[in-house]
């Protein structure tokens, strides 16, 4: 599990990105690069790191579910992910 400070930092940054999303898109349409430079750099969605929403693990992230492969496996075995079942071939 990642440090609690990393998890909190990630959540805080995601809120910041959502806060400035509409303003960023308007400024980009107008090509107002001076205005864009006034917005905090951390408000850019490119700077976000995909992290597990449960325990903050930065690697092995599955986008569709928003969790890491380890948590995905654990929750799938417990039957807590709707529509997910173990397959065999």
From Swiss-Prot:
This is Small ribosomal subunit protein uS14. It comes from Phytoplasma australiense. The keyword Calcium does not apply. Pfam families: Ribosomal_S14. GO terms for molecular function: rRNA binding; structural constituent of ribosome. Belongs to the universal ribosomal protein uS14 family. Part of the 30S ribosomal subunit. Contacts proteins S3 and S10. GO terms for biological process: translation. Keywords: Ribonucleoprotein, Ribosomal protein, RNA-binding, rRNA-binding. NCBIfam families: PRK08881.1. GO terms for cellular component: cytoplasm; small ribosomal subunit. Binds 16S rRNA, required for the assembly of 30S particles and may also be responsible for determining the conformation of the 16S rRNA at the A site.
